[in-house]
Regions:
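Short, charged, low-complexity loops and linkers
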Residues: 13-24, 90-94
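Internal, hydrophobic cores of structured domains that mediate oligomerization or house catalytic pockets
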Residues: 48-150
Length: 261
């Protein structure tokens, strides 16, 4: 898949979600989350919420193609960025819970791809003019992530355990990972935008290694989190197509956030 515009990104993600649903492939979990983020960004572009809608279409297309390239490389010969290999490599591991699959995708896409896409959209000094729209895209991402995580609760009855043993100050674990990462992503975007090709390659490699290390911590956490994950996994739905369909419709359920603290 190579997207030319944001509509192509939405269509490409919808295709992956459809295919994953048919095949019972957990790659559809993050793809469903990401499809909804992209639909919300497109709605914001059409609604004139960004300073420069055409620029954000370009940004989102570059961002989406980073995911499609990683997905295609993994499917082809298990290659691609390290952090995406970590995420895709856990798709067949029965012990990984739904929310881990989501966080692994969010980790790779924010900690590696977001900064690269931003720097390519607005290279050099132009990067500073992107900041407001960059933060707005992150707000949209955070909102969709929270809604999807709330919807995971219906499939994963003991998910709230993670907040108690793993996340600081009772913050939802996915929300924390998004907000923690976005300021770093902006810093790295500014860094990349001002670098030459050789410097940029070295920075991208460093970001990939760091995101891959984070992915390993997400996949195999220590301490109290591990037994909590085993308990959560034992009560989660095993019906992968049903989970994908549920996640893919999270934004269409207005009541999903009610009753969540």
């Amino acid at each position: 898949v190579t997207a030319e515009n944001i509509d192509d990104v939405v269509d490409g993600l919808a295709g992956i979600v459809r295919e994953a649903g048919r095949a019972g492939d957990r790659v559809g979990y993050f793809a469903a989350l990401y499809r909804q983020v992209t639909v919300e960004v497109r709605t914001a572009i059409h609604g004139g919420l960004f300073d420069d809608g055409a620029r954000m279409d370009r940004f989102d297309t570059l961002f989406g193609n980073r995911y499609f390239d990683a997905y295609d490389a993994w499917r082809r010969d298990r290659s691609g960025p390290r952090c995406w290999r970590e995420a895709f490599g856990l798709l067949d591991e029965a012990d990984t819970i739904i929310v881990q699959h989501l966080i692994l995708g969010v980790n790779a896409h924010i900690n590696l791809d977001l900064a690269i896409a931003a720097a390519r959209t607005s290279p050099g000094e132009a990067i500073h003019g992107l900041r407001r729209d960059f933060l707005l895209i992150n707000d949209i991402l955070g909102r969709v992530v929270l809604t999807v995580q709330d919807s995971v609760g219906a499939l994963s009855p003991f998910l709230s355990l993670l907040d108690r043993v793993g996340a600081r100050n009772d913050e939802r674990i996915l929300d924390f990972s998004v907000r923690q990462s976005r300021e770093e992503a902006w810093y790295n975007a500014v860094l990349l935008a001002g670098q030459n090709e050789k410097e940029r390659e070295a920075t991208i490699q460093r970001l990939d290694i760091r995101a891959a290390v984070l992915a390993r911590l997400i996949a195999r956490p220590a301490g109290l989190v591990r037994p909590a994950l085993q308990l959560i996994r034992s009560t989660e739905s095993d019906d992968v197509p049903a989970v994908i369909a549920h996640l893919d419709n999270a934004m269409e359920r207005p009541s999903v956030r009610q009753g969540t603290g």
